[in-house]
Amino acid sequence: MRPSGRQPDQLREIRFTRRFTKHAEGSVLVEFGDTRVLCTASVDDRTPPWLRNKGSGWVTAEYGMLPRSTHERMAREAARGKQGGRTQEIQRLIGRSLRAAVDLEGLGERQITVDCDVLQADGGTRTASISGGYVALHDAITHLMKQGKLKRNPLFGAVASVSVGIYQGVPVLDLDYAEDSNAETDMNVVMNDANAFIEVQGTAEGHAFRMDELNSMLALAQSGIQDIIAAQRAALEQG
């Protein structure tokens, strides 16, 4: 039995609240159960120095957790003077995942930065950041198109992510903190709306997992991501 009472293949309740803040070109509060992440997409009409005058744009991401997003207060990374390795790993994952959905030449010589700030953490913050970050990115690109700054939509399609794992010997979908902290295997999967994989990260924590368990986890992720993409589309169709 999962601590939340969910079935092995059941997602937490997912919600995307668009235009959550007023200044960013794209702004989304994404909720996966009790995990809440604010994703904002900001447009800069300059590219990184290494991309200047090359006719291509860039999408990057930054990730952070509020000090009391967890059970006990964490010191701000800014106060420590540097980002931790986990933070750098996660924001690179988010950036790679979102770039997989964008024709960077079609974006033109500009950069979109997607900031993912965890307000409350209950497992799956990186997967929520990718799923919410896509919606914020979509809105930022729509903003550019409405302003006439893009000739065509550079988005290939949707991108979403979810965690899967083995908890008490059973493959499960969308782990919360209680499950994640006790899982025998933890895996993060990123896919697009063409049902293709962008990234798979998996680690055996308790015991090595078998091929049949891997296939079960990937099947759970595939099904869950289809549902997340449907929720993204429903949010974006609200205009």
UniProtKB/Swiss-Prot annotation:
Any single Pfam family the record assigns to this protein: RNase_PH_C
Enzyme class at the top of the EC tree: transferase
Gene Ontology biological-process entries: rRNA catabolic process; rRNA processing; tRNA processing
Protein's name in the database: Ribonuclease PH
Binding site for phosphate: R86, G124, T125, R126
Swiss-Prot/TrEMBL keywords: Nucleotidyltransferase, RNA-binding, rRNA processing, Transferase, tRNA processing, tRNA-binding
Presence of the UniProt keyword Protein biosynthesis in the record: no
Gene: rph
Subunit structure: Homohexameric ring arranged as a trimer of dimers.
